[in-house]
Regions:
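Active-site rim/loop-helix segments in enzyme catalytic domains that contact anionic ligands
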Residues: 1-67
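Metal-dependent de-N-acetylase/amidase catalytic core
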Residues: 51-196
Length: 196
């Protein structure tokens, strides 16, 4: 997680506590999903993220440490059909992840200080982008998947003024994504195979 979300929420009385509240909400949401490890980056301010060299380096370091074959991230592209997909922080993180995956994470000459720290180059095989203007990959969700997603999102109490509305939006989105494929529910992505 790049920021602690300290500029999010709508309750101004909680402004001083917002960063820690949002971190706690993220921890609980990840527990609901069975996430084994949650990493928070430090030094990036909510609402002010840009795909800087420092952010790319931090993502490269994480990629080299974890060595994933697949990364899920947000699209760096504008999606004019959905205002929610266009948060500038989300697009900036998507751009930084893209630059980190190729070429930096696999290039031994990129960020030599990481190599000196024992973080060897790594090739991420696929990146799945969510929220972009186009999709080319669908993952079927069963009812348990949808319920887990709803429970996780409901942990973000300070993020959403109307959690029931958000739950309905999640359920409807899963249904809409699944319908053309004969699924009760689905999640759509743009899938980028980085192997060529």
């Amino acid at each position: 997680v790049v920021t602690d979300g300290d500029a999010g929420g709508s309750d101004q009385d909680l402004h001083q506590q917002m960063g820690e509240l949002r971190r706690d909400e993220q921890r609980r949401a990840c527990e609901r999903l069975g996430v084994a490890e949650l990493v928070f980056f430090d030094g990036y301010h909510d609402g002010m993220v840009t795909p800087t060299r420092d952010l790319v380096r931090d993502i490269v370091a994480l990629i080299r440490r974890v060595q994933p074959t697949l990364i899920l991230t947000l699209s760096p592209e504008y999606n004019w059909s959905s205002i929610y997909a266009n948060h500038p922080d989300h697009r900036a993180v998507g751009a930084a992840v893209t630059d980190a995956v190729y070429p930096a994470a696999r290039n031994p000459f990129a960020f030599p200080e990481l190599l000196d720290a024992g973080l060897e180059p790594h090739v991420v095989q696929e990146v799945w982008f969510q929220g972009g203007p186009s999709t080319n990959h669908v993952v079927e969700l069963d009812q348990a998947d949808i319920e887990a997603k709803v429970r996780a999102v409901r942990e973000h109490i300070t993020q959403f003024d109307d959690l029931d509305r958000m739950e309905n939006w999640i359920r409807q989105g899963a249904s809409d994504a699944g319908r053309p494929h004969g699924y009760a529910g689905a999640e759509e992505f743009f899938r980028w195979d980085t192997r060529g």
